[in-house]
Amino acid sequence: MNKFFSLLLTLLVSAVAFAETPLNYKGEFVGTAGNSDLAPYYMMSNNGGVVTQGKNALLRVGAWKDFDLSKRFSYSFGVDAYAGYSNSKDYLRYNIEQGKVLPMAQKPAAAVLQQLYAEVKFRGVFLSAGMKERKSPLLNSYLGSGDFVQSNNARPIPQVRAGFVDFQNIPFTNGWVQIQGELAFGKYMQDGWLEDHYNYLNGFINTGVWYNYKRCYFRTKPSQPFSVTVGMQMAGQFGGTRKFYVNGELTEVEPYDVKLKDFWDMIIPKSGGNNFGDTQYFNGNTLGSWDFVARYRLKNETELKAYFQWPFEDGSGIGKMNGFDGVWGFEYDSKKPDAIVSGAVFEYLQFTNQSGPTHWAPNDNPDSSMEGEATGGDSYYNNFRYNSYMNLGMSQGTPFIPSIIYNEDGYMRVLDNRLKGFHLGITGKIYAPLRYRMLLSYRKSWGTYSNIRIEPAKNTSFMLEGIYDFKQVKGLSLKGQIAFDKGGLLGDNFGGGLTLSYNGLLNIFGK
C-alpha cells in the first residue's frame, strides 16, 4: 500500500507540470470547543470524518484540479491533508494481567492525509485511484441526513473506481433514458484504529478487510420539467482476518483468503466461496439500497424533489419485506442562492422493521428438525462475521444510525439501528455576504433485535451555522457553528466552532 501511494504522489507531481486550468487550492484553520469528548452530532457528521472530537485546533491545506468536461480526454487530481490537536477519549479495554477492563485514552492522529487521488476520463468514462471524499450520488449531502450506502461521513478509503462521469444517454432512446454507474474496489486502512479501540474481552475484530462499491441508476430526460431517477447501490466487505475473543481470551482466528474469483463474486453477490459462511451466504458482508428520486421543475427554475431509499442487508430487504424501513424525503431548491430560504430538506427515517426480529436458516442448525426459514433480524450495518460498516469509527452510510465511535465499551458493532425519527435542513442568505444553514433532528431508538433497550433512548440534535464571505478579500470566509445534542442516545453535548478559510485559483499552467 505504501508503494501505491508513492507512485500516486509521483504521478500527481508530474501532472501539475502539465496541468490544465484551473488549479484550485484551499487553506483553512478549524477550531472547535465543547463540553464533551466527542463533538455534537451535526458538527461531526457528513464532514469526511475530519472533526470527531469535542476540542480541536486543525490546519488543513489542499489543492485539486477537476475534469475539463468540454474535452474528450481530461484528467483530475487532488491532495488534501490536515494536522493539529484533538482531545482524547477513553475506551474500555481488557487488561489480561489485572483481569479486568480499564479505560484507555485514544485520540485521532496528529497529522492526517485525507485525500490523495488521480483520475482520467475519456468521453463519458472515468478511472480513479486513491483516496477521495465522495458524497451521495443522488441526495443532498449539505442539507440531508446522509445516504444509506455512500455518504461523506467517514474518511475516504483507498480504492480504484471506474464508471460513467455523469449520466449518459442510452443509444436509440433519443436522450429519453440515461444511465449512470460505478464500480470500486479498495482496502481499509483502519486496522490500527480497530486494534486501539477494541475491548479484547468479547466479540471479534476484523483486520485486513477489502471494500467493494457499485451502483446503477436510470434517469428520464432531465431537460423535461418532470424527471425520474431509479436504481440500486450496494457496498460490501470481504477478505481479511477475524479474531474472536471470549472472556479476554483469543479463542478463534479465521483467515478469509481472497482470490481473484472473490472480486467477481462481489460484483454479482452469490454464495459458494471457500471461506466459512460463504458456502451458505453471500460472499462477504453485503448491504445496499433501492433509490428513487422524482424531480419537478417549475417555470421559475425552482425544483421540487420527492425521494426514498429502501435499505437492505439481504434478499428479504431487496424484496421489500422490511415494511416502511427507509429514508423518505422532500427537497426544495429555489436555484436562487441569495434567497432567504434557497434550499430545504425534510426527511422521515425509519429502520425498525428489519424484515422481522428472527433469522432462522436450516443450514445454520443441521441438528434441528425445523425446516422452515425466517429471513429477518437484518440488523442494518452489522454482520455475523464482520465489524460494523464503518471506517475509523464513523459510519460509511447515514450517521442517523449512531456510529461505533460512540461505543465507549469498545464494542465493534452498531448498538442502535432500530430507530426512527425526522431530519430538517434549511439554508439561505440573511443578506448578501452571510449564508446560514440550520439542521435539526429527533430520533428514538429501541437498540437492536439482539440487544433490545429496556427503555427506548431519545435524542434531539441541532446546529446553526453561519458563513460570512469577505468582500474585501475574494475567497476568504469565516464560518461559525453552534450545536447541541440532548437525550440518552448520544448524550448531552454542547459545542461550537470557527473555521477561517481561503480558496483560490492558479492559472499559471494555462495556455
Task: Report the location of each language-model feature.
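Extracellular loop and loop/strand-boundary signature of outer-membrane beta-barrel proteins
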Residues: 44-49, 82-84, 94-104, 144-150, ...
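Bacterial Sec-dependent N-terminal signal peptides
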Residues: 1-23, 500, 504-506
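Outer-membrane beta-barrel pore domains
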Residues: 277-511
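Internal, well-ordered domain-core segments that constitute the primary functional module
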Residues: 134-247
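Outer-membrane beta-barrel translocator domains and adjoining extracellular loop/strand segments
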Residues: 38-44, 88-96, 109, 139-146, ...
